[in-house]
Protein backbone atom coordinates (compact mmCIF):
# COMPACT_ATOMS: atom_id res chain seq x y z
CA UNK A 1 0.00 0.00 0.00
CA UNK A 2 1.32 3.41 -0.95
CA UNK A 3 1.13 6.27 1.48
CA UNK A 4 1.20 9.78 0.01
CA UNK A 5 -0.75 12.82 -0.76
CA UNK A 6 -3.03 11.01 -3.08
CA UNK A 7 -1.74 12.91 -6.08
CA UNK A 8 -0.29 11.05 -8.93
CA UNK A 9 2.65 12.45 -10.67
CA UNK A 10 1.83 13.12 -14.27
CA UNK A 11 4.35 12.21 -16.86
CA UNK A 12 5.02 14.62 -19.65
CA UNK A 13 3.96 13.49 -23.06
CA UNK A 14 6.62 12.80 -25.64
CA UNK A 15 5.54 15.91 -27.58
CA UNK A 16 5.97 18.13 -24.51
CA UNK A 17 9.37 16.59 -23.74
CA UNK A 18 10.53 17.24 -27.31
CA UNK A 19 9.23 20.82 -27.15
CA UNK A 20 11.15 21.51 -23.94
CA UNK A 21 14.28 19.92 -25.42
CA UNK A 22 13.97 22.08 -28.55
CA UNK A 23 13.48 25.24 -26.48
CA UNK A 24 16.55 24.42 -24.38
CA UNK A 25 18.66 23.68 -27.47
CA UNK A 26 17.52 26.88 -29.22
CA UNK A 27 18.18 28.86 -26.01
CA UNK A 28 21.68 27.44 -25.64
CA UNK A 29 22.51 28.07 -29.31
CA UNK A 30 21.17 31.63 -29.23
CA UNK A 31 23.06 32.39 -26.01
CA UNK A 32 26.29 30.89 -27.38
CA UNK A 33 25.91 32.77 -30.67
CA UNK A 34 25.22 36.09 -28.94
CA UNK A 35 28.16 35.57 -26.58
CA UNK A 36 30.55 34.78 -29.44
CA UNK A 37 29.27 37.78 -31.42
CA UNK A 38 29.82 40.06 -28.42
CA UNK A 39 33.34 38.74 -27.76
CA UNK A 40 34.21 39.13 -31.44
CA UNK A 41 32.84 42.69 -31.42
CA UNK A 42 34.84 43.51 -28.27
CA UNK A 43 38.06 42.33 -29.95
CA UNK A 44 37.18 44.26 -33.11
CA UNK A 45 36.46 47.42 -31.08
CA UNK A 46 39.83 47.15 -29.34
CA UNK A 47 41.58 46.56 -32.67
CA UNK A 48 39.73 49.50 -34.25
CA UNK A 49 40.68 51.75 -31.32
CA UNK A 50 44.34 50.72 -31.57
CA UNK A 51 44.38 51.26 -35.35
CA UNK A 52 42.74 54.67 -34.97
CA UNK A 53 45.06 55.97 -32.25
CA UNK A 54 48.11 54.65 -34.11
CA UNK A 55 47.08 56.38 -37.35
CA UNK A 56 46.25 59.68 -35.64
CA UNK A 57 49.49 59.65 -33.61
CA UNK A 58 51.57 59.00 -36.74
CA UNK A 59 49.74 61.74 -38.65
CA UNK A 60 50.23 64.31 -35.89
CA UNK A 61 53.88 63.32 -35.40
CA UNK A 62 54.53 63.84 -39.13
CA UNK A 63 52.61 67.13 -39.45
CA UNK A 64 54.88 69.96 -40.66
CA UNK A 65 53.14 72.50 -38.39
CA UNK A 66 54.06 70.36 -35.36
CA UNK A 67 57.74 70.55 -36.29
CA UNK A 68 57.41 74.30 -36.84
CA UNK A 69 55.67 74.82 -33.49
CA UNK A 70 58.29 72.77 -31.67
CA UNK A 71 60.95 75.17 -32.96
CA UNK A 72 59.23 78.17 -31.34
CA UNK A 73 59.76 79.57 -27.85
CA UNK A 74 56.16 78.68 -26.87
CA UNK A 75 55.15 75.34 -28.47
CA UNK A 76 51.85 75.00 -26.52
CA UNK A 77 50.53 78.26 -28.01
CA UNK A 78 50.41 76.72 -31.51
CA UNK A 79 50.15 73.04 -30.67
CA UNK A 80 47.16 73.14 -28.28
CA UNK A 81 44.59 74.52 -30.79
CA UNK A 82 45.93 72.19 -33.49
CA UNK A 83 45.75 69.13 -31.21
CA UNK A 84 42.20 70.00 -30.14
CA UNK A 85 41.03 70.42 -33.77
CA UNK A 86 42.53 67.08 -34.75
CA UNK A 87 41.11 65.42 -31.62
CA UNK A 88 37.60 66.61 -32.45
CA UNK A 89 37.90 65.66 -36.14
CA UNK A 90 39.39 62.21 -35.45
CA UNK A 91 36.96 61.32 -32.65
CA UNK A 92 39.67 60.47 -30.14
CA UNK A 93 39.60 61.47 -26.48
CA UNK A 94 43.03 63.03 -26.19
CA UNK A 95 46.10 64.12 -28.09
CA UNK A 96 49.08 64.93 -25.92
CA UNK A 97 52.19 66.33 -27.52
CA UNK A 98 55.15 66.45 -25.15
CA UNK A 99 58.86 67.03 -25.06
CA UNK A 100 61.20 64.01 -24.75
CA UNK A 101 61.17 64.41 -20.96
CA UNK A 102 57.38 63.95 -20.90
CA UNK A 103 56.43 67.57 -20.20
CA UNK A 104 53.06 68.17 -21.89
CA UNK A 105 52.63 70.83 -24.56
CA UNK A 106 48.99 69.85 -25.15
CA UNK A 107 46.17 68.22 -23.22
CA UNK A 108 42.33 68.24 -23.44
CA UNK A 109 42.39 69.89 -20.01
CA UNK A 110 44.53 73.02 -20.48
CA UNK A 111 45.35 73.01 -16.75
CA UNK A 112 47.40 69.83 -17.35
CA UNK A 113 49.70 71.52 -19.89
CA UNK A 114 53.20 71.74 -18.43
CA UNK A 115 52.65 68.68 -16.25
CA UNK A 116 54.23 65.26 -16.63
CA UNK A 117 52.77 62.74 -19.06
CA UNK A 118 51.52 59.59 -17.32
CA UNK A 119 52.51 56.48 -19.24
CA UNK A 120 55.36 54.71 -20.93
CA UNK A 121 57.57 56.53 -23.41
CA UNK A 122 60.78 54.46 -23.60
CA UNK A 123 59.88 52.69 -26.85
CA UNK A 124 58.90 55.96 -28.56
CA UNK A 125 62.07 57.63 -27.28
CA UNK A 126 63.93 54.79 -29.03
CA UNK A 127 62.15 55.77 -32.26
CA UNK A 128 59.32 53.20 -32.34
CA UNK A 129 55.59 53.82 -32.09
CA UNK A 130 53.64 51.52 -29.80
CA UNK A 131 50.21 51.03 -28.24
CA UNK A 132 49.26 50.26 -24.67
CA UNK A 133 46.35 50.35 -22.27
CA UNK A 134 47.16 52.78 -19.48
CA UNK A 135 45.35 54.71 -16.77
CA UNK A 136 46.13 58.39 -17.16
CA UNK A 137 44.48 61.64 -16.13
CA UNK A 138 41.32 60.79 -18.13
CA UNK A 139 41.10 57.23 -16.78
CA UNK A 140 41.98 53.95 -18.52
CA UNK A 141 42.61 54.35 -22.23
CA UNK A 142 43.92 52.58 -25.29
CA UNK A 143 46.69 54.83 -26.51
CA UNK A 144 49.46 55.05 -29.05
CA UNK A 145 52.71 56.90 -28.48
CA UNK A 146 54.70 57.99 -31.53
CA UNK A 147 58.03 59.77 -31.86
CA UNK A 148 58.38 63.14 -33.60
CA UNK A 149 61.65 63.20 -35.52
CA UNK A 150 63.77 66.29 -36.13
CA UNK A 151 65.81 67.01 -39.24
CA UNK A 152 68.70 64.80 -38.10
CA UNK A 153 66.21 61.97 -37.43
CA UNK A 154 66.53 62.41 -33.67
CA UNK A 155 63.45 62.23 -31.41
CA UNK A 156 62.53 65.82 -30.54
CA UNK A 157 59.03 65.22 -29.12
CA UNK A 158 56.40 62.55 -28.57
CA UNK A 159 52.71 62.33 -29.45
CA UNK A 160 50.25 60.26 -27.44
CA UNK A 161 46.74 59.72 -28.78
CA UNK A 162 44.08 57.81 -26.87
CA UNK A 163 40.52 56.62 -26.71
CA UNK A 164 39.20 56.04 -23.21
CA UNK A 165 38.06 52.56 -22.26
CA UNK A 166 34.72 54.08 -21.21
CA UNK A 167 34.19 55.32 -24.80
CA UNK A 168 34.93 51.83 -26.14
CA UNK A 169 32.64 50.32 -23.48
CA UNK A 170 29.81 52.69 -24.47
CA UNK A 171 30.07 51.45 -28.06
CA UNK A 172 29.98 47.84 -26.85
CA UNK A 173 27.05 48.57 -24.52
CA UNK A 174 24.96 49.69 -27.51
CA UNK A 175 25.99 46.57 -29.39
CA UNK A 176 25.07 44.38 -26.42
CA UNK A 177 21.60 45.91 -26.27
CA UNK A 178 21.13 45.21 -29.98
CA UNK A 179 22.38 41.63 -29.54
CA UNK A 180 19.92 41.02 -26.71
CA UNK A 181 17.02 42.21 -28.87
CA UNK A 182 18.11 40.03 -31.80
CA UNK A 183 18.75 37.03 -29.55
CA UNK A 184 15.31 37.40 -27.95
CA UNK A 185 13.70 37.60 -31.40
CA UNK A 186 15.57 34.51 -32.61
CA UNK A 187 14.63 32.66 -29.43
CA UNK A 188 10.97 33.63 -29.86
CA UNK A 189 10.96 32.46 -33.49
CA UNK A 190 12.70 29.25 -32.48
CA UNK A 191 10.14 28.57 -29.76
CA UNK A 192 7.22 29.45 -32.02
CA UNK A 193 8.56 27.15 -34.70
CA UNK A 194 8.82 24.25 -32.30
Task: Report each predicted region and the residues it spans.
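Cytoplasm-proximal transmembrane signaling helix
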Residues: 173-194
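Extracytoplasmic/periplasmic sensor domains and loops in membrane signaling proteins
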Residues: 103, 107-139
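Generic short beta-strand
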Residues: 94-96, 132, 146
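Juxtamembrane segments flanking the first transmembrane helix
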Residues: 9-101
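Non-catalytic regulatory/interaction regions at protein termini and inter-domain linkers
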Residues: 1-11
